[in-house]
């Protein structure tokens, strides 16, 4: 089916979602499975960047991810320690892969990383022991470091570094209108969290332990401007606080400067790790 045909089929299935079960067959099941396969292979994305820099969200693709839960039964997934396993209804992206599939995929997956079916991982990505949820998109040259989490339908650009323990929020629960987006060439410092559909624009650097959601104040130290929901391109952002009522200060994220060569030397990717 074309994307237009898939969209129409998914929208119809969404309207009748309460009737969809693992026993569902025919065009409805085919549309859901084909959409999930397109997401998995990178031919379709939940969100796409437009020429003017805005992001268009394919809401129907997000709906297909949710409908995928309706057509699968729970089952044992083997491979745990001491012969144990897991109980789930979402397949691993790597289920049934042999050497030829790994070579064709072109990314590195360190033992104990988890990627769920319908997430796309581009060639040149390095996955340390981390978690990438369904519907996500991780573009080429990106490092997903140890214990980092890429949430459902999140969009991660090229040559991004997600440091240890970083959390990039998903959209499925609680439901968000748009996915969390990290654009190309960003550096997200250890244990930082970016959630609720926030967009981190190209080349931005978040220091260690920066937390940004839609209600987080993002303050430009130089101008005093306060913004929400979007980190400007090539900003260097650290944790801070702002005075509030009652003599207390509340958390905020502070833009302390724009990226310069000194910052780039500390946050640049190491090509040796991508070979």
From Swiss-Prot:
EC number: 2.3.1.117
A molecular-function term among this protein's GO annotations: 2,3,4,5-tetrahydropyridine-2,6-dicarboxylate N-succinyltransferase activity
Subcellular location: Cytoplasm
Binding site for substrate: 108, 145
Transferase as UniProt keyword: yes
Gene Ontology biological process terms from the UniProt entry: diaminopimelate biosynthetic process; lysine biosynthetic process via diaminopimelate
Substrates-to-products reaction catalysed: (S)-2,3,4,5-tetrahydrodipicolinate + succinyl-CoA + H2O = (S)-2-succinylamino-6-oxoheptanedioate + CoA
Keyword field: Acyltransferase, Amino-acid biosynthesis, Cytoplasm, Diaminopimelate biosynthesis, Lysine biosynthesis, Repeat, Transferase
Pfam families found in the cross-reference section: Hexapep_2 (PF14602), THDPS_N_2 (PF14805)
GO cellular component, one term: cytoplasm
Pathway, per record: Amino-acid biosynthesis; L-lysine biosynthesis via DAP pathway; LL-2,6-diaminopimelate from (S)-tetrahydrodipicolinate (succinylase route): step 1/3
Chief location bin: cytoplasm
NCBIfam families for this protein: dapD, PRK11830.1
HAMAP family listed in its UniProt record: DapD
UniProt similarity note: Belongs to the transferase hexapeptide repeat family.
Binding partners and assembly: Homotrimer.
The protein, known as: 2,3,4,5-tetrahydropyridine-2,6-dicarboxylate N-succinyltransferase
Organism, scientific name: Ruegeria pomeroyi (strain ATCC 700808 / DSM 15171 / DSS-3) (Silicibacter pomeroyi)
Gene behind the chain: dapD
């Amino acid at each position: 089916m074309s994307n237009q045909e898939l969209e129409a089929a998914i929208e119809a299935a969404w309207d009748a979602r309460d009737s969809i079960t693992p026993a569902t067959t025919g065009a409805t099941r085919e549309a859901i499975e084909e959409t999930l396969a397109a997401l998995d292979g990178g031919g379709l994305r939940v969100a796409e960047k437009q020429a003017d820099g805005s992001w268009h969200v394919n809401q129907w693709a997000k709906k297909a991810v949710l409908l995928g839960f309706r057509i699968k039964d729970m089952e044992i997934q083997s491979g745990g320690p001491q012969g144990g396993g897991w109980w789930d209804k979402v397949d691993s992206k790597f289920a049934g892969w042999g050497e030829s599939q790994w070579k064709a995929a072109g990314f590195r997956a360190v033992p104990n990383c988890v990627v769920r079916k319908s997430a796309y991982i581009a060639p040149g990505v390095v996955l340390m022991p981390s978690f990438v949820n369904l519907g996500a998109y991780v573009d080429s040259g990106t490092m997903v470091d140890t214990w980092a989490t890429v949430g459902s339908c999140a969009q991660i650009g090229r040559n991004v570094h997600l440091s240890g323990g970083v959390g990039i929020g998903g959209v499925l629960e609680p439901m968000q209108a748009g996915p969390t987006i990290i654009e190309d060439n960003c550096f997200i410092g250890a244990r930082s969290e970016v959630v609720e559909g926030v967009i981190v624009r190209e080349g931005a650097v978040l220091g260690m332990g920066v937390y940004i959601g839609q209600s987080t104040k993002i303050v430009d130290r130089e101008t005093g401007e306060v913004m929400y929901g979007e980190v400007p391109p090539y900003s260097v952002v650290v944790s801070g606080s702002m005075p509030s009522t009652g003599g207390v200060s509340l958390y905020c994220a502070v833009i302390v400067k724009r990226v310069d060569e000194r910052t780039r030397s500390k946050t640049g990717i190491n090509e040796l790790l991508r070979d």
